[in-house]
Structures are given as C-alpha cells and as structure tokens.
Swiss-Prot record:
PROSITE patterns in alphabetical order: ATP_CONE
Name of the protein described by the UniProt record: Transcriptional repressor NrdR
Pfam families in alphabetical order: ATP-cone, Zn_ribbon_NrdR
Co-factor note (free text): Binds 1 zinc ion.
Organism of origin: Bacillus velezensis (strain DSM 23117 / BGSC 10A6 / LMG 26770 / FZB42)
Family to which the UniProt record says this protein belongs: Belongs to the NrdR family.
GO biological process, one term: negative regulation of DNA-templated transcription
Zinc finger (unnamed): 3-34
Record HAMAP family: NrdR (MF_00440)
Listed NCBIfam families: transcriptional regulator NrdR (TIGR00244)
GO MF term set: ATP binding; DNA binding; zinc ion binding
Residue spans of biased composition, Polar residues class: 1-10
PANTHER family, alphabetized: TRANSCRIPTIONAL REPRESSOR NRDR
Domain ATP-cone: residue ranges: 49-139
Length: 152
C-alpha cells in the first residue's frame, strides 16, 4: 500500500477492525519510511445482482429502491423504519445466497409481500395494489379475501 504522504510502497498495519456491517475491514497503517499514519478500507468485490423486469429489462438490484417502495406503502402506518430496513437487508441476503446473478422481479415482489403481510396488513394491501396493478375494486376485494383466508 503506497503512503499518501511520501508514496513509499511499504506500510505496516497497526489496527484492523470490521466496518460497514462486516462487509469491509478498516485498517490503520503506518508508513515504514516517513511514519505517516493513514486509514484504508478493504472490501470484497460483490458480484452485481441483476433484476429481470416483466418486460425483460435488466437493472441492478437496489436495496434503496425496495426500501423507498416499502416506506411509501407504510406511510402513516405504525411500522418502524428499522423493521423495513431489516426486511430489505434480509431479502437481499436471501437473494444473494441463492448464488445466481439474475432474479426475476416477480420473485422479489413476492418476497416483499410475504414479509409485509406479516408486519402490517394495510401496508401489504397498499403495496400489492401497486405491485399487482389492481385494475378495479373487484381485484382489490379478491386480494382482501385472500388475506383474510391466510389469517385463518
């Protein structure tokens, strides 16, 4: 690792600790030549996870995009932000653990709806109405009936 002060190629590690929820390592280093101290971060390269949309369009998975949709569905509902963040983290982890580079958007949507139904039914119906593109009140009523059946 080159020293940012003198450009010498040698440094020694003084301290290492996990960072970014364990996804990287923070290292405190000291240059062997000028004794300048600096911090580096070591991070493994994550393979991108691609979401294949219904129309065949491919885009990189975004936990932030999923969280924004959930926040919108849970607006004015008693659902803590931390719960939604944890849900997004768990879904991403589960998708990455499948060991595939591409997933269908339908799978992601179903995973979100399964979890959201257990957290808040009103938010679930809001999310489902947008995700499944309810065309009229009858489709909405059918979804509510399915939700009631699942509870029993």
């Amino acid at each position: 690792m080159k020293c940012p002060s003198c450009q010498h190629n040698g440094s020694r590690v003084l301290d290492s600790r996990p960072a970014d929820e364990g996804k990287s390592i923070r290292r405190r280093r000291e240059c062997e030549a000028c004794h300048y101290r600096f911090t580096t971060f070591e991070k493994f390269e994550e393979m991108p996870l691609i979401v294949v949309k219904k129309e065949g369009v491919r885009e990189e998975f975004s936990r932030e995009k999923m969280l924004r949709g959930l926040i919108k569905a849970c607006e004015k509902r008693p659902v803590p932000l931390k719960t939604l963040e944890d849900m997004c983290f768990d879904i991403e982890k589960e998708l990455r653990n499948q060991g595939v580079s591409e997933v269908k958007s339908e799978l992601v949507g179903e995973m979100v709806m399964d979890r959201l139904a257990k957290i808040d039914e009103v938010s679930y119906v809001r999310f489902a109405s947008v995700y499944r593109q309810f065309k009229d009140i009858n489709v909405f009523i059918d979804e509510l009936k399915d939700l009631i059946k699942k509870e029993r």
